[in-house]
Swiss-Prot record:
Pfam families: SHMT. The lineage of its organism: Bacteria, Bacillati, Bacillota, Bacilli, Lactobacillales. This is Serine hydroxymethyltransferase. Its EC number is 2.1.2.1. (6S)-5,6,7,8-tetrahydrofolate binds at residues 121, 125-127, 355-357. The gene is glyA.
Amino acid sequence: MIFDKEDYKAFDPELWNAIDAEAERQQNNIELIASENVVSKAVMAAQGTLLTNKYAEGYPGKRYYGGTAVIDVVETLAIERAKKLFGVKFANVQPHSGSQANAAVYMSLIQPGDTVMGMDLSAGGHLTHGAPVSFSGKTYNFVSYNVDKESELLDYDAILAQAKEVRPKLIVAGASAYSRIIDFAKFREIADAVGAYLMVDMAHIAGLVASGHHPSPVPYAHVTTTTTHKTLRGPRGGLILTDDEDIAKKLNSAVFPGLQGGPLEHVIAAKAVALKEALDPAFKEYGENVIKNAAAMADVFNQHPDFRVISGGTNNHLFLVDVTKVVENGKVAQNVLEEVNITLNKNSIPYEQLSPFKTSGIRVGSPAITSRGMGEAESRQIAEWMVEALENHDKPEVLERIRGDVKVLTDAFPLY
């Protein structure tokens, strides 16, 4: 806008070279990390504006600084678009991240030491759903629910029985590595049965909810949180939604001044852009293709008996694969695939026996390749390369050939 690329490169070549190298890496890699995506140029342009110069503590119409009339317009656009997209009465667009959005909900609805139920990390939950190393596990008495050991699916009857036993004040639904549809209506029934609040963290599936390809939690949850990146394809940040006016007031106070100071209005502008993009009819096609591409990749792994797809498949943007019959652990698999320029992450699987630094599985996601325009045929080919690379992880000539094939594919689907 004011400082163009060449000026920046001349001023700080070391940093620009690093950014340039990352741009090259993203172009030449197949990105399968389920929490990553490819934002539009419009999102990047908004985030790079001089809105970053402005302090705007407070909320539209109630700021602690002067000169915020234009900022109020920007933030209100983001709020109204979020409300329209998800069909909700109240939205807070200020959280800097999904973790901070979750923290704001906890601060609003419960007290330190209160009992909360959240999904076990190895079953697909998130750090902020009660992991001992997280603020959530340190501040509140989290009790983890799990998936059924045989089906690897959520067992709602078992969760209800557990809730009746521990009597939580809050139940957290949502996941970072669960490949099936979550029944939010069932979760609300469970919460009501024990007099608990229901919070849904839809960070991973928000884009699919927006596109109509996953049931919305909004009609059932007292509060819904999400990130604005991942499947929603916006900038990194958080978002909180509710239909309850009293809860909305508590949430606003928890975000500011409870957890944060000045909001990042340049990021909020980028959120507004992403929300407008998600309101476009074309986003429905994107959501459909994300699911088709994930299913196509999972199907390939299901055809190779040495790999085990957790729960047998996927209904969303990701799936997990147990790789321990082929390589030592998930970390080894991640490293092998990175050698052929396919990027994903090691991931724990239900009832994990290995440490989180090694894991038995990998997590595979389709949002980024779908944003690049790849379809089911490309997705199947990518999965075949993954299988071949892992089965031949000790054969450099095979890995070199696959790396060349990957380059041909990424050249055909430019990042921008």
